[in-house]
Amino acid sequence: MSVNVFVTGGAGYVGCALTGRLLQEGYEVTVFDNLMYGGRGLIPYFVDPKFHFIKGDIRDKQHLAEAVRKADIIVHLAAIVGYPACKRDPRLAEDVNIEGTRNLLAVRGESQTILYASTGSNYGAYTGALCTEETPLNPLTLYGISKTKAEREVLDAGNALAFRFATAFGVSNRMRLDLLINDFTYRALKERSLILYEKTFKRTFIHVRDMAASFSFAIRNLEKMKNDVFNVGSEKMNYNKEEIALKIQEKVPYYLHFADTGKDEDQRNYEVSYEKIRRLGLATTIDVDQGVDELIRAYSVIDVHSEYSNL
C-alpha cells in the first residue's frame, strides 16, 4: 500500500515543487489549499491518478478533519509567508499561521506524523556566531513570531518534526517574485537597476527544489528525525545582500546603487549552521549560480511582477 502524504498549502511556491517530487517518488499526494494565490502550478499533476486535490482552508476545522483522515504523513506548509504579507494583514497571519496550525494538531490522528515548515526567521538578528538549533530564538517580525509559536506547539504535540528553512529562491510552478534572490534577479533583468539598502545584512539561502527534497528525505528517515528540529540549508549559501547583487550582476548587466540612507524593514541578519542535518545525510544540491541561471531563463516568459508576489 502506498503512503498517502497530505500537503497543506500545496498549491504554493514550495508545495508545487514538493508535490511533483513526491508523485515522482510514488507517493499518493493530497493537496489541501484554499487557492489564495491560484492553482495553476498544480495543473500538470492532475494527469497523475496518485494526485488528489481538496479546496479548503486550515481555519475550517471541520473540513480539515474530514480531509486529513486518510493521511499517513502531513506536510504543513499552509501559512501567510514573509514579513510584508503578515504586516499587511496581521489578523489573517495569526489566524492562519497559529490558529490554523492548532486546528491541524487538534484533528490529526495519533499515528499521523507532521512535518512542519518553519523558518530561519525565528532567529531574527544574531551576529557573532553561527545559529544552531540550540540558539535562543529572537523573531523580529510577526511572521517570525507566528512561526516560532506554531513550531513550538507542533513539537510539543509530539510525533512531529520541524525544518527551519533558509530563505527560499528559485524557479517553481507557482513562482514568487517577492523573495530576495528572485526579486533582485527580476529587477536586474527587467528594470536594469537595483537600489540596495543595508547591503551587509546576511541571509542563508536554499533552492525550492532542495526544500522539497528535504521533506522527501524526512519521510524516508522519520524514525531518526521525529520530535526534533533541524536547520535546512548550507553554510556555503550564507551571503549578504551585496554579494547576491554582485553575483547577479556577473550574469546580467544592470545599474546597482548602494544607498547610504534608507532602511530595510526586514531587519533579519544572521548566519546558520546546518551540521545537524548534514550528519544525517542531507545536503543541498543547487547553488545560487545555478538557481539564478534558471531564473533568468524563466523570466523570459514572466512580465507581470504582481502576479507572482505574495503581496
PLM regions with names:
Residues 146:
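Active-site helix of classical SDR
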Residues 191-192, 196-311:
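C-terminal substrate-binding subdomain of Rossmann-fold SDR/epimerase-dehydratase oxidoreductases
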Residues 140, 152-203, 208-219, 248:
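NAD(P)-dependent short-chain dehydrogenase/reductase
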Residues 58-95:
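NAD(P)H-binding glycine-rich loop region in Rossmannoid oxidoreductase-like domains
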Residues 2-73:
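N-terminal Rossmann/SDR dinucleotide-binding element
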Residues 8, 32, 74-78, 114-120, ...:
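SDR active-site strand-loop-helix element
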Residues 76, 102-142:
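Conserved Rossmann-fold NAD(P)-dependent oxidoreductase catalytic core, especially the SDR/UDP-sugar
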